[in-house]
Amino acid sequence: MRVYPAAPTGHVFVVDGDPGKLTVIDPKSDSAVATIDAGSKLETAVVGGNGKLYVNREQKQEIVRVDTATNEIDAHWPIPNCSSPHGLAIDLETHRLFSSCENNLLVVVDADTGTTVATLPIGARSDAAAFDPKRKLVFSSNGDGTLSVIAEKGANSFVTLASVATKVGARTMALDPESGRLYLVAGDTTINPSADPSDFRHRYVVTPGSAKLLFLDPMP
């Protein structure tokens, strides 16, 4: 479950991932005022400055746009060649969405039209994306133990800068937009030889008590 505040209504949007629904809460009345059914599993959502909320629809490989004034879905945008879109971030200045996919791709989408403007290589099994608005950097945290770093040179121009080694399973990420510091969570892992190598979730077993907080500071 993820919770997002959305202007200008002041409502709170709760993403119920597996059921494929969003619950809209009015914090003033402390009550649910609407339920939006997207029809299948949802992943990360972001809020634009235009009263729209965007959310990855994983199994359909698309981005769904929600009008927060009416609490209705007003667009379905396919994400070409994107298997299991998980992470989603937004540049509010250029109106660009960054959707990270499990199959080594990050897809850049125009947040106004739904047009794909770029497709970039990233690490495998991405679970989160982040955008640093001060430094114009896009990040993808990947389950294969890498952090992909991409520079936004313009609305339709992007350059891959680095693949930073992290830890296997370090897929969850948060960004401090002021300092530019990135935080990731991971633990030590052992390999389960009986699990298929393609079954990432059961192949790598986290050692109890080994959780670590990793962080990456921007270049000075």
Q: Where are each of the predicted segments found?
A:
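Predominantly soluble domains enriched in secretory-pathway, periplasmic, or organellar proteins
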Residues: 1-220
